[in-house]
């Protein structure tokens, strides 16, 4: 069934340079990221309009003007900078789908919920953990922030900030490998190993 699979279905992660969107909240859970009433949708696309729905809209579905995503100056931002323990709560992957579909490709926070962190890499989103003081500084960054994944560095107008990521997770994003592609790569390596490790027959 997968004989013709190309091995790449996510977009390869390239350098990103945009202004940041500051979300000054801690313990943002997955139900706040995308409310449960929208989980019946099964396609990954289309969730962007439901991102932070209860914060973006009032009971009449009018935009709340005091919410950061409704500020026009952040409309083209691809970088969300937020508080600790982002993505906590239930393990719904829809939360990452909503962030990615809205346009966020990088999330910067002091810490993430473990399952949310893993789900980011499955969907082409880069989660970056930095010290809280640095995160607070980036929330108030007036210029553009550049994300250079290959060299693992963030660049502001005045400084370069290194960040950590595992070599495997880095490869997943740089090559745009989804879970199926990762599995096929592993199968190829296992087959190659078995081919060169056959036990000789015993006479």
Label the predicted regions:
Residues 28-30, 41, 154, 170:
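Short, acidic Gly/Pro/Ser/Thr-rich loop/turn segments
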């Amino acid at each position: 069934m997968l004989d013709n699979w190309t091995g790449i279905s996510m977009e390869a992660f390239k350098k990103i340079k945009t202004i940041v969107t500051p979300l000054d909240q801690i313990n943002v859970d997955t139900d706040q990221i995308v409310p449960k009433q929208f989980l019946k949708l099964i396609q990954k696309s289309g969730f962007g309009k439901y991102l932070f729905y209860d914060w973006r809209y009032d009971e009449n579905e009018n935009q709340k003007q005091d919410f950061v995503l409704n500020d026009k100056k952040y409309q083209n931002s691809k970088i969300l900078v937020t508080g600790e323990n982002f993505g906590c709560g239930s393990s719904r992957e829809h939360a990452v789908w909503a962030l990615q579909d809205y346009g966020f490709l990088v999330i910067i926070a002091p810490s993430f919920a473990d399952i949310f962190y893993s789900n980011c890499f499955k969907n082409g989103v880069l989660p970056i953990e930095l010290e809280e003081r640095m995160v607070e500084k980036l929330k108030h960054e007036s210029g553009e922030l550049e994300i250079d994944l290959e060299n693992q560095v963030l660049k502001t107008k005045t400084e370069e900030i290194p960040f950590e990521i595992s070599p495997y997770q880095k490869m997943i994003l740089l090559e745009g490998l989804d879970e199926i592609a990762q599995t096929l790569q592993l199968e190829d390596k296992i087959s190659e190993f078995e081919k060169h490790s056959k036990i000789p027959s015993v006479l």
